[in-house]
């Protein structure tokens, strides 16, 4: 039984035949595979190795906040869960493992600053660095002023920073004045 990106769908195994399907069920009983959501199973060893295929678990989900800050190395804090942004009106059943926190956004805010990256062999959607800084400012009271300040300092220390793009995103996300005040103090 081959695993594609550490995930197995029961439908693809059924196509291979009854024997393959029973082997998959036996692997679940023995603890080698874990049910992520209905019809999708994952290899335990590969899940614990690092990044998981978020697209398989939550289609069209975008890594945001702590997960995105970690990917872009904007903070030294490690995320306790995968933070995934989805459309506000969408309902998604989240599996018990891996731990995923959903953040709901309106469709016009959701699409600002989305890029695709390949991380540990998985193609994932994630917010770009400028959007991540704006999110840190927007949610500064929830994540803490110290984390927000660390993210801004790290961003400003990078040679590839793009202040005009940052301010454009900040205006769209309605944090332009607040971010402007931070930048006046920091620069």
Please provide the spans of the model-predicted regions.
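Active-site loop and adjoining helix of the penicillin-binding protein/serine DD-peptidase-beta-lactamase fold
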Residues: 2
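Nucleic-acid-binding surface
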Residues: 5-15, 23, 28, 36, ...
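Glycine-centered, phosphate/nucleic-acid-interacting loop/turn motifs that mediate DNA/RNA or nucleotide
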Residues: 31
